[in-house]
Amino acid sequence: MSKLIAVPSRTKEILEKYGIRAKKGFGQNFLVDPVIVEKAAQMSHCEGAVIEIGPGIGSLTEQLARHSRHVTAYEIDPSLIPVLADTLQEYDNVEIIEEDFLQADIASKTKELKEKYGSVSVCANLPYYVTTPILFRIFEETDIPWITVMVQKEVGERFAAAPNTPEYGALSVESQYLFDVKKLFNVPGRSFNPSPNVDSVIVRFERKPDIPDIDIKAFFEMVRGCFKQRRKTVYNNLKEYLDDREAALQVLEKAGIEPKRRAQELTCDELLKIYEALK
Ligand code: SAM
């Protein structure tokens, strides 16, 4: 068995062999820390099938292949496809799809994998420039119960933030409405080649059972409206969102929310009350 991919010397060797330079435009930073990839895979509930976004040269994919029955990995960069065929040749449970994850039919793929392998999870070191759109596709278009991702530390803090903290915003409400969000551990810049200027964190989203059956896109839109200008009161933001003063006051009264409060003081449940009053 060859050396692990996620060690500095092997990664360097692979990058040199294929003349690869990490592409900033694709958010490429390759993990070179075997402990981190192992821990991420172990904690991701990937026993059945696991979907990875952006396998890069295969550092995390390798650990996922060892821990799960099947890995489906979407890679946007065509130049990495032959590299992955080489680095992951020992693993016959890995399917690499050369595609932009944001364009992929993930609902059908999830269904297919669930039928075949019993369960589907997500585990990825996400490209930073598309972290939020990727996560929201998975949140809204699949019912995947466990999503474990490495993201920039600041972004991870926003996902996991509690009300009345500077990081708390629409992103926190939207993710915590659907998931229990847990920061697992920090990953320093030196764990990557090339090292990014910022630290990262691994965040795990566990889908909540029994989420009220509402139009989540409409709810999220209203939440974004309530947070639009953070310094304004919820009344002022809602008034602009609805383009109607009276309606905004009535909705807040019906929801039992004091109009002078600001969105960052409101819990997810309180924002849901506003949405329900609106409907
Ligand atoms: N998983 C590898 C690792 O941990 O070493 C690479 C992670 S790197 C931060 C992000 C990876 O996502 C790169 O391989 C990049 O080419 C790929 N990527 C970027 N945008 C993508 C997209 N829209 N769809 C699929 N892959 C994408």
Give the residues covered by each predicted segment.
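C-terminal lobe and adjacent flexible extensions of AdoMet/dcAdoMet transferase-like proteins
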Residues: 207, 225-279
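Catalytic cores of RNA-modifying enzymes
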Residues: 1-225, 253, 264, 273
